[in-house]
């Protein structure tokens, strides 16, 4: 009975620690154990009863420890939480070598023995973080797309109804330098752009310059080659013409030299013939030969006339007489010509 009372007291302590829900669940088991303890008085029943109570405490310690572990997790919402509590019990585990062969099958051999020591309770203070919990403030007017770019004009939602439109006012003396600086900046930007354009144009011109020079040099060299070819052809033609003229001159010179030689020879022969008297003899022989030819032609004509006369006499044909007259007329003409030639010679 004392052992049963000890088990009951331990169960009550554990129920007080574990909470209201667990206590309510354990109440019917308590009544059952008390009624069974009143009925049974054996040692084995008491041992089994203690074993069941210990098993019940073990099963109930599982969810409670898990609950306390969940409670130990830090949360930023409620800083006021109960302190963590851990209960330590001295349990001795008895591992038997094996069931005895002679033991009855219904006997229960306890495997856990309780020591006669009071349980120890350890309190762990909750760890409080020194850093303050960061609170995220939600901006109802947060627009990431609009705020990621530079603002040109305010968003309609950010405008205030009390803000009035700016009135048209005159420009003061303070605003003129600002406008002038803006103009100067714009002029400077335009000048820099123009300078950049000019620089790019100069770069392109410098890059295109050697190409143009190479093209020009190639064209000039081609033109020079053509001019050289033309000059060479002209020189060849002039040389050919000069050679032809020189050959003609040489021929003329040769002809003139030959004629001069002939004339000199003739003059030399004339001088020699005139000095020797042979020239007059040659002239007379030449004239005599010419007279001889003339007399020979006259003799031939005279023979023809004699024959014509003989035929005309024999035939008394007027045609023959006509032929005779024609031949005589020719002889007369020839004689007159000879006379005129002689007179001219004289």
From Swiss-Prot:
Entry keyword Kinase: no
Record field: compositional bias (Polar residues): 50-68, 205-222
Recorded GO CC terms: cytosol; nucleus
Keyword terms of this UniProt record: Biological rhythms, Coiled coil, Cytoplasm, Nucleus, Repressor, Transcription, Transcription regulation
Annotated Basic residues bias: 179-192
Highest taxon of the lineage: Eukaryota
Compartments, record wording: Nucleus; Cytoplasm, Cytosol
InterPro entries linked to this entry: CIPC
GO biological process, one term: rhythmic process
UniProt biased composition (Basic and acidic residues): 1-42
Disordered as annotated region, ranges: 1-83, 167-228
Coiled coil: 283-315
Disulfide bonds: none
Predominant subcellular localization, coarse grouping: nucleus
Free-text function comment from the UniProt entry: Transcriptional repressor which acts as a negative-feedback regulator of CLOCK-BMAL1 transcriptional activity in the circadian-clock mechanism. The physiological relevance of these observations is unsure.
Name of the protein in question: CLOCK-interacting pacemaker
Organism: Xenopus laevis (African clawed frog)
